[in-house]
């Protein structure tokens, strides 16, 4: 125990003998010429008689602050995991694309003209019937595309013939015969127009019956 105490006392004496040379050095300060300089730690320890014990910490003390910060930033960047090159999944992009697709689905298609739609119907009317249903000197009646006015499809009242008025032969003058001819022409024209319309409606109805049957069969299938 006495040997340990004497060794500690001798060590403290050596340290005490080393202190004055370190702190006796004064740094002149006049406000302008004062500046800090970096010094090699080994030279500093050797100059003051202190045995050098090089460690990782002592080596860092020799480096300027800027270099230390550079090393720290480099080490932190090296330690950080590399950024993935895969594109980041953005939920907002998915939502916007979904909304745009839904809007496209909701868009109503352009209306189709029913007159342009043709149904495959096996309908071949008699050419003679088509002639009877056509206006003389006009185009041949087409039961597939012909359209009637609303007035044409209304039920027509029954026309009663007027009672015949007996006219004596001595009263049948030129004026009488002229009026009678006009009435006969008008009556014939009315009968022909009525018969033409009836023929057209009949053939058109026959075609619509065929078309209706074909559509019902297609829907059922």
Swiss-Prot record:
Induction annotation: Accumulates according to a robust circadian rhythm.
Biased composition (Low complexity): 73-100
Region (Basic motif): 175-195
PROSITE patterns: BZIP (PS50217)
A Pfam family that the UniProt record links to this protein: bZIP_2
A cellular-component GO term for this protein: nucleus
Location(s) in or outside the cell: Nucleus
Chain positions covered by the region annotation Disordered: 72-116
InterPro entries: bZIP (IPR004827), bZIP_sf (IPR046347), PAR_bZIP (IPR040223)
Leucine-zipper: region residues: 196-203
Gene Ontology biological process: rhythmic process
Entries under CDD domains matching the protein: bZIP_HLF
Keyword Transcription regulation attributed: yes
SUPFAM superfamilies for this protein: Leucine zipper domain (SSF57959)
Keyword field contains Transcription: yes
Molecular function GO labels: DNA-binding transcription factor activity, RNA polymerase II-specific; RNA polymerase II cis-regulatory region sequence-specific DNA binding
Highest taxon above the source species: Eukaryota
Keyword set, alphabetical order: Activator, Biological rhythms, DNA-binding, Nucleus, Transcription, Transcription regulation
Domain bZIP: 173-221
Function: Transcription factor that binds to and transactivates the TSHB promoter. Binds to a minimal DNA-binding sequence 5'-[TC][AG][AG]TTA[TC][AG]-3'.
Family according to the record: Belongs to the bZIP family. PAR subfamily.
Subunit description: Binds DNA as a homodimer or a heterodimer. Can form a heterodimer with DBP.
Name this polypeptide is given: Thyrotroph embryonic factor
Organism (species): Phodopus sungorus
């Amino acid at each position: 125990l006495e040997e340990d105490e004497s060794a500690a006392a001798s060590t403290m004496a050596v340290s005490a003998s080393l202190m004055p040379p370190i702190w006796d050095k004064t740094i002149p300060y006049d406000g302008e010429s004062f500046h800090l300089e970096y010094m090699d730690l080994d030279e500093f320890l050797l100059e003051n008689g202190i045995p050098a014990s090089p460690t990782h910490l002592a080596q860092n003390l020799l480096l300027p602050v800027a270099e230390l910060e550079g090393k720290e930033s480099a080490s932190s960047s090296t330690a950080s995991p590399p950024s993935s090159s895969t594109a980041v999944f953005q939920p907002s992009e998915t939502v916007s694309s979904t909304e745009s697709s839904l809007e496209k689905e909701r868009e109503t298609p352009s209306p189709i003209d029913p007159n342009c739609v043709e149904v495959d119907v096996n309908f071949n009317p008699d050419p003679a019937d088509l002639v009877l249903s056509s206006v003389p000197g006009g185009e041949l009646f087409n039961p597939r595309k012909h359209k009637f006015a609303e007035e044409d499809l209304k039920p027509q009242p029954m026309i009663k013939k007027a009672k015949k008025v007996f006219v004596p032969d001595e009263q049948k003058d030129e004026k009488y015969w002229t009026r009678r001819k006009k009435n006969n022409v008008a009556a014939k024209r009315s009968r022909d127009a009525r018969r033409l319309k009836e023929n057209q409606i009949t053939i058109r109805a026959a075609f619509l019956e065929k078309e209706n049957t074909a559509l019902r069969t297609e829907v059922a299938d």
